[in-house]
């Protein structure tokens, strides 16, 4: 881990989203507001579901975990990003490792938390008579624990592979947080193992979690089409509508980043897309789930009385 003159790299420089002073001031205010709204929204959702006993169900148990992951996700990047805008743009080697590790871990955790939520909706609509058995407290705890254990295990493995590389080309990271791809570009050692491990992990986790979601919704759609009454179909659709919107928002931004041909993927475009799944998704999820959910809206009214 040394630079071109042989001295050890003890810190990195994060270039951020822009080097324009006027835009930096605007971005600081914008992301500070977004972060505060994210904190308020996700903490509010967690507290609401803890306080109202009617929301002590498997669906809201998973939603509480999703809100917690989103809260940690945006908190991992925003404070450092805001600090870099108003002061020095540096981050220590250990700080960069920690941020990279937590980012990967929480990204993977969210993949499988959304998959667990899709399974919950599948059981509720496709097999309602066995819902209490298939989503017992023990099952729910296992389904919610797996994303954290797997996400933080694979995240640690990926982060260790990255920071075992030798960094000698530069200490400047063209991003607003310590991300794997720009870090790999700074390495002057062989990145074959790391690049392939990253590709395999990204491909497997994205495809496997999305497959669980799509298969679950295929069964849900089949069950809904068998419902004869229009009111029953509408109720079933509304039950999983919020989750479908959250999945579309989260996976949609990731596909925009990785599905395009490599020639079209500029660094600046990648940073802008990263803003969406780092900041936009966490701030919108509480709104999506509260505005389309009668139980949440009623619980909020009860608390505000």
Curated annotation (Swiss-Prot):
Mainly localized where? membrane
Task: Tell whether Transmembrane is among the UniProt keywords.
Answer: yes
Q: What GO molecular function annotation could you give as one example from this UniProt entry?
A: G protein-coupled receptor activity
According to the record, the signal peptide region is: none
Where it sits in the cell: the answer is: Cell membrane
Concerning CDD domains, the annotation shows: 7tmA_OR5M-like (cd15412)
Report the Pfam families cross-referenced here. 7tm_4
Cytoplasmic topological intervals: 47-54, 120-138, 217-236, 292-305
Q: Which residues are glycosylated?
A: 5
In terms of InterPro entries, this protein maps to: GPCR_Rhodpsn (IPR000276), GPCR_Rhodpsn_7TM (IPR017452), Olfact_rcpt (IPR000725)
In this UniProt entry, which cysteines form S-S bonds? 96-188
User: Which intervals lie on the Extracellular side per UniProt?
Assistant: 1-25, 76-98, 160-195, 258-270
Describe its membrane topology. Answer: Multi-pass membrane protein
TM spans, by residue? 26-46, 55-75, 99-119, 139-159, 196-216, 237-257, 271-291
Q: Does the keyword Acetylation apply?
A: no
- One cellular component term from this protein's GO annotations in UniProt: plasma membrane
Keywords assigned by UniProt, alphabetized: Cell membrane, Disulfide bond, G-protein coupled receptor, Glycoprotein, Membrane, Olfaction, Receptor, Sensory transduction, Transducer, Transmembrane, Transmembrane helix
Hey, which family's this protein in? Answer: Belongs to the G-protein coupled receptor 1 family.
**Function summary:** Odorant receptor.
> What's the protein called, per UniProt?
Olfactory receptor 5M11
Species of origin reads Homo sapiens (Human)
Q: What does UniProt list as this organism's lineage?
A: Eukaryota, Metazoa, Chordata, Craniata, Vertebrata
């Amino acid at each position: 881990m040394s630079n071109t003159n042989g001295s050890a790299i003890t810190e990195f420089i994060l270039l951020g989203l822009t080097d324009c002073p006027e835009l930096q001031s605007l971005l600081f205010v914008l992301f500070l507001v977004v972060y505060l709204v994210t904190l308020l929204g996700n903490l509010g959702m967690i507290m609401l579901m803890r306080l109202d006993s009617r929301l002590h169900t498997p669906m809201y148990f998973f939603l509480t975990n999703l809100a917690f992951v989103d809260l940690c996700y945006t908190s991992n990047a925003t404070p450092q990003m805001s600090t870099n805008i108003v002061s020095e743009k540096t981050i220590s080697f250990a700080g960069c490792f920690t941020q990279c590790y937590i980012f990967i871990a929480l990204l993977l955790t969210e993949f499988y938390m959304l998959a667990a939520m899709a399974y919950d909706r599948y059981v509720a609509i496709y097999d309602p008579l066995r819902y209490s058995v298939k989503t017992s407290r023990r099952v729910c705890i296992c389904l919610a624990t797996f994303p954290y254990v797997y996400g933080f295990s694979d995240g640690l493995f990926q982060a260790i592979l990255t920071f075992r590389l030798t960094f000698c080309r530069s200490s400047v990271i063209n991003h607003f947080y310590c991300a794997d791809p720009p870090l790999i570009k700074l390495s002057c050692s062989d990145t074959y193992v790391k690049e392939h491990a990253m590709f395999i992990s990204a491909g497997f986790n994205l495809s496997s979690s999305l497959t669980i979601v799509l298969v679950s919704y295929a069964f849900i759609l089949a069950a809904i089409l068998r419902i004869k009454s229009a009111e029953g179909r509408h109720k079933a659709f509304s039950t999983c509508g919020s989750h479908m919107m959250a999945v579309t928002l989260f996976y949609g931004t990731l596909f925009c980043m990785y599905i395009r041909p490599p020639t079209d993927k500029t660094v600046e475009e990648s940073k802008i897309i990263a803003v969406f799944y780092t900041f936009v998704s966490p701030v919108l999820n509480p709104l999506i789930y509260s505005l389309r959910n009668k139980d949440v809206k009623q619980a909020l009214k009860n608390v505000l009385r």
